[in-house]
Structures are given as C-alpha cells and as structure tokens.
Amino acid sequence: MKKALFYTVIMLAIQCGLGSAVLLIWALVTGQKPDVTNNSMIVVTTVVDLLIMVLFLALKWAEVSPRWIRTRPWAVLCWCVLASLGLLLPSIWLQELMPELPNVAEEALVGLVSSPWGYVAIGIMAPLAEELVFRGAVLRALLQWRPDNHWLGIAVSAALFALVHMNPAQMPHAFLIGLLLGWMYYRTGSIIPGVVYHWVNNSVVFAAGHIMLSVGWDVDNMKLADLFGSQTTVLMAVGCSLLIFLPSLFQLHLRLKK
C-alpha cells in the first residue's frame, strides 16, 4: 500500500511542480501568459506525461514487458476497442443521473479539445502515462500487497486513478473505467489492453468534443437529450451501447490471460 501511495504522490508532485516550471519557461520563451487559449497547456501536459513515463521506467517502478503481446492477442485488443466504445454512452448517462459535481477543469479541458494538437496530450500521452503509473506501478504494488484479494487492489487503484484527475466531474467515470482497466491488468499482467481501451475512450471523447466546438455547440451545458433529441432516444442509445459492451466484456472474460 505504501508503494502505491508513494507512486501516486510522486505523479501528483511532478504534475504540479514540473507543470508550473514548464509554464514559467513557456512564459519566458514566448512572452505569452499561459492559459487555455494558447498551446501552453498542451505543451505542459505532454512534457509532464513524457517525464513521468521516463522516470517510472528508468527507476523500474513500472514493469513493461513484451511477453503478453508476443502471444498475438489481436482478438482481445479488438474486444477492448468494442468494450470502450460500448461503455462511453452508458457511463455519461449514469453520470448525468448523479448529483451535479463541480467541473473545476472544464475550462482547461475545453482548451485542450479545441486545438487539434490537444489530441497529443489527451489521446496519446494520457493513456500511456496513466496506464504505466496506475496499472504498471500502482496496481502492481497493490496486487503484491494483497495477493489474496485482487479486487481490493483493483478498487484502491481505481479510486486513486479517479482522485488524481482532481476534477470531481470526471471522478465517477474515471473510477468506473479504473475498475475495468485494473481487472484487465490483473488478468493479463500487461498494460497494453488498458492502453488500447484508454486510447479509444479518450480519442472518441476528444473527437466528439472537437467537432462540437468546431460547429459552435455549447458543450459546457450539453446533455445527452440535447444530442439525441429526447430521453427515449437516449435510453435506446444507451441500450444499444450496452449490447456492444456486455458481449465484449464477456469475450474479454473468456480470452484474457497472461
């Protein structure tokens, strides 16, 4: 447990400390005040995630091995893609049913999504860095701590994964995904299924947000009913999504192995 908390604190310290340093360098080099209207947040997020990965790999806090991918689990990766696509709408719908939580990172997220370069930070670097840290390091340490109760480790790692986002509005979705990603890591011992799932999730969210911002939609206040036209259509869409997610989850249950 101590190792898992240590890794989480280190990641947060790098994000806050190094992020502030990169923002200062940005301001000195470009003469621009760092904010969400320019590329400073994209640069900061990308640099911080890259350095986090280098640190965790260099100090061997996270383990990355080609053993699992050498088994050629292409069908498993396809089911990961489908599972990610199938859970998106139900997760958003579930979040809308919950009491509204503060979205303290809304402005920053909109700034990242509004630029095509934001995909580097959201769609590429975030899945790699977060899976390396939270599954490759944090969950690995938790599974070693309590090998007799893997769901405890998975739940704790999912909670830490949700908390590190530091945005209450994102936490329910992050925790839900964290449980699934943790289970996939436990079954395979590899972060690759999680990276693929995470990449698809973030890519779809980025693409949808970018398109909606490009056409002038008010993404800040948009609900699923606004997008689909009625609550009935929303429920139909959620049901169709579950018809994708649940069979995908079943196939992963059958196929995931180390």
Label each region the model flagged.
Residues 5-9, 43, 77-82, 116, ...:
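Hydrophobic alpha-helical transmembrane segments
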Residues 10-14, 125, 156-160, 172, ...:
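Hydrophobic residues within alpha-helical transmembrane segments
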Residues 10-60, 76-80, 235-240:
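Alpha-helical transmembrane segments in multi-pass membrane proteins
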Residues 26-27, 31-40, 62-132, 139-145, ...:
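Juxtamembrane helix-loop-helix connectors linking adjacent transmembrane helices
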Residues 55-65, 184-188, 246-256:
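Structural signal for the C-terminal ends of transmembrane alpha-helices
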Residues 129-156, 183-190:
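Membrane-interface helix/loop boundary segments of multi-pass membrane proteins
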Residues 163-169:
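Membrane-interface helix caps and helix-loop-helix hairpins in membrane proteins
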Residues 199-258:
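C-terminal membrane module of polytopic membrane proteins
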